[in-house]
């Protein structure tokens, strides 16, 4: 039997033993060494040669990733590790650290139970470390810590034993502070990482060695010895004595939970159904004979196999050739193949049981976030995947040859399916195709992928996505239907920050409100008792409240009113951008008794015009997306770096000192960030480290608003000036 066949056989055996499975992700800030670490773990599992590990970038099997040297997608791999006389199946997902690809992290975190957080010993805890850790903890994923690039502290920064330990203590305290702030209440203390219990390891992924306290006790190797090995340039020998894979995978097996342990506390958090039901109990017990429950985390298109859906099996078993049901789209499909991953290749099996990561071919029509169950069964869906950031930059895409237009539409739909953080808008009337992404790099990669599918495209300059809101209030605004037989009266005011945050954090889910289920939550966030029971709709960070009493026929047009409210917010009156942060209350209504006179053609324009008119009466305001920008530069370049930020309308939030480096934390509008990479490099002569994180929307300075509104309207082919309230209400 070849080594590969042995490996396949082991993976197939271990799939059925949930106590011996670990589903883990590796998360970190960009360039802190995630993919290098993954490669080493694979080398150990006999997947790639150990000589090449570190340079191989095995999980980066997309050309773009190898070329840019960063991870763009989350890649899946399964491997077998022996620990204390038992073999374990470790399913590993490598995730991107670049802010533009945060959506992949969110999806990967839904599939795993534990995470190895990699932090660079030189840079310490960085903004993106915080973002990825927050995503992990939000999904109830337990962390352990690996401090990487320790050799650089010794060889480049020349730190001695005591200084090393100080640096480590500081990094660990930083990570634990984040865990304490962001972990679920019951795990704030239990999940803290500690040197003494082995939940923290140190090492160099590039040079293949790592150590933690249990390993020190086993090998008698101390930090003094490590400093000596590094100083004598003898890290190869060190890597033979303290093998990185033994330490990291040992830590994973010892401290991160098996599906059996994790599903008990994770399922209630990520699944919206009744935990006491048959399928609820099946998932909690990781029971492979209970009803099927799969959460799709990723869909990719393979040249040979077509659409491949990757997901986590939480309950039951998914079988080859079986009929399955998509809960979200209410449609059915038949699986062609099911299997697990080994590196980028899939190993097909007859079935994949609960607790595993599955690859399904033939699941046509699946999208990331979909829930799959047996064809003759319907279960409640998994909670939708919350992305921490929203798309903020848009480009228009055109096919170079007109004959390629149908292909362009097809390719855009494919790309949108593969990457749910991308918003693809295909406007068939204007013929405009827009893609909105997380930033400049995200869109560059998507365009490269479109070209890669054999399609030549031209793109516009990147355009920033704005939002509309209000700064004032308006009361008793009347909207009339075209036939004048229906009238609606609304009040409008800005939504409180407290409610906005609750919606952003996912405490209040977006969507039409059924009954009084959220009344208590609305009350906790500032609505009075009566109002809290009357919220009809939460949409794009705005809410629609029905404050009327005893209006005849209102229930019959309730759905139409919500549709009108939603479509008005989809493109606001100021610049046709989406509106947010608005509370609209329906105060009174006069509705025609004859159903013919109160159909969609009458109700929709009436409510839309009322909303538009009210917005224009309540000091309409444009909001722009902001990014936090973190810069670390030598002191001599501090002034130049600060000027670079201030020239872009940036505000300096905080400045600090780390050894001989200065740190600057600032907030800059996304519209001013194009070309920043080149400018900051030349300002600091290449000697700076910088990173960004999306930071929501803020109001545009008054003096710029008219100019920007005019530019947006002209770009969209609208009249240069927005219409006044009378246009909508007259």
Swiss-Prot record:
Q: Supply one GO molecular-function term.
A: translation elongation factor activity
Positions of post-translational Diphthamide modification: 597
Q: Which residues form the tr-type G domain?
A: 19-229
Localization annotation: Cytoplasm
Q: Which UniProt keywords apply?
A: Cytoplasm, Elongation factor, GTP-binding, Nucleotide-binding, Protein biosynthesis
Q: Which GO terms describe its cellular component?
A: cytosol; ribonucleoprotein complex
- Positions contributing to GTP binding: 28-35, 94-98, 148-151
Which is an annotated Pfam family here? Answer: EFG_IV
Which branch of life, at top level? Archaea
Cystine pairs = none
Q: What is the protein's known function?
A: Catalyzes the GTP-dependent ribosomal translocation step during translation elongation. During this step, the ribosome changes from the pre-translocational (PRE) to the post-translocational (POST) state as the newly formed A-site-bound peptidyl-tRNA and P-site-bound deacylated tRNA move to the P and E sites, respectively. Catalyzes the coordinated movement of the two tRNA molecules, the mRNA and conformational changes in the ribosome.
What PANTHER family does the record point to? Answer: ELONGATION FACTOR-LIKE GTPASE 1, TRANSLATION ELONGATION FACTOR-RELATED
- Would you identify the family this protein belongs to, as annotated? Belongs to the TRAFAC class translation factor GTPase superfamily. Classic translation factor GTPase family. EF-G/EF-2 subfamily.
List the HAMAP family hit by this protein, alphabetically.
EF_G_EF_2_A
Protein name listed in UniProt: Elongation factor 2
